[in-house]
Structures are given as structure tokens and as C-alpha cells.
């Protein structure tokens, strides 16, 4: 049963609503953590468990129904905010989990690992997964036809929330960006690496460091690890044009404008 505790909280909230927050106090008692979830000044629920002692960050779904707690001990907690209950603990094959994301309609969850203890080997466990929240079930993986793409903590959606694009840093380097259906997780297109200019010493093209979709979801803008921006057809993966090299600040501004205006 949850226990009432003094509030000496470490704020660990990355909330979709400015009014929602999760305050977590560690070591109360030793080895445990205590969480109080608020909507503004209203306490929604509180809990004390061992699992909360390892939490490093928290994130709410856009509708405020769900909460995920990220940890540095190889798991992610999913909580139902309305019921004040922990729904599931997802087990990761590595210690520190840096991110997890909800879809804009709050019905799906993206993880950069398999999510439970059933994978047959370590590499199976590292496959990014896509979950339905009600009912809670894994719908599939987000690695398409290759292990070098998928969700690794970087995902963005079109204006309607129907498509999503990932820029993966799996296996220690920028890989191809990929576009998926945000309801089913089905792959739509793998965007080829941005080709190097003629005469360059490098071959094979540069992987994606970041990516955005146009508001209508029909085009994608990719910022590659070589510092260039390139525009793609998000359905066919055709490279439409390479905009050229920009610094990270300029790239960020162009990516955000593209997501807002498609320009």
C-alpha cells in the first residue's frame, strides 16, 4: 500500500502538461523511493516502492493519462495516472534508459529495447519496440528491414500525428532515418543516407543525426552527421534535394520551421 511521507522532493518531470509533475524522493526508507504526482497543487496519488529509487527522469503522455519513469538500473516503469497504479515494468538489456516517447494521441509508447524478459538473446533485447497502451501489448518492432534503423530516443511526428520519423544512433553511429505509421508502427520508408558530393573521400553516405516531417507528413527533412540538410519524399524515400551544410544551431532552426510550415 502507498505510504504517506514528508515531501523533500527531487523534481524529475518532463511533462506534456505544465500542470502535471512527478515529485520523487529517494531513500525513504533506505533503498526505496517515494513519488507524489500532482496536477497543479492537487495531489493525484502517491506511492512508495523500491523501483522508484533508480528513477532519473519522468514523462507524461500528452493527455496526462500515462506516466513513464526512466531509470539507470535497466528498466522503465509505466504508471496509470488516473488509477494511481504501476501498470508494467519494462526490462532493458542495458542499465541507463535515456528516453521513451508517447505518440501524440497518447495511445502508443516507443521504447528503444524489446521491453520484457522473453527475447532469445541480447541483440533481440536491443530491438526498439512499439506498444499499445490499452490493451497493453507490444505491436511490433521499429527496425524495419534492418537493425541499423529504428527508435533510439529521437522521434518526431507530423501535424496530425499519423506519421513519425526516427533518426537512429543505434550501434554507435548515425544510421538511416525511417518513417513509420504512428498508429500501427508499420514501416513506410527508410530514407537512404545522404550521399557525399563527387570527389569526397567518404563513401556510402552519411547517417541521420535528426529529422522532421512536414506538417502533412509527405516530406522529411534530415540533418546528417556530416552537417548537411536533405529533403526526402516520406512515402517513397526519394531524395528530393540536398540543402547544403549548416551548423547545428542553423539546422535546428530549419528543422523546426520545416515541421511547422513545410519550408
UniProtKB/Swiss-Prot annotation:
WD repeats lie at residues 53-89. It comes from the Bacteria. The keyword Oxidoreductase does not apply. Keywords: WD repeat. SUPFAM superfamilies: YVTN repeat-like/Quinoprotein amine dehydrogenase. The keyword Glycoprotein does not apply. Signal peptide: none annotated. This is Uncharacterized WD repeat-containing protein DR_1725.
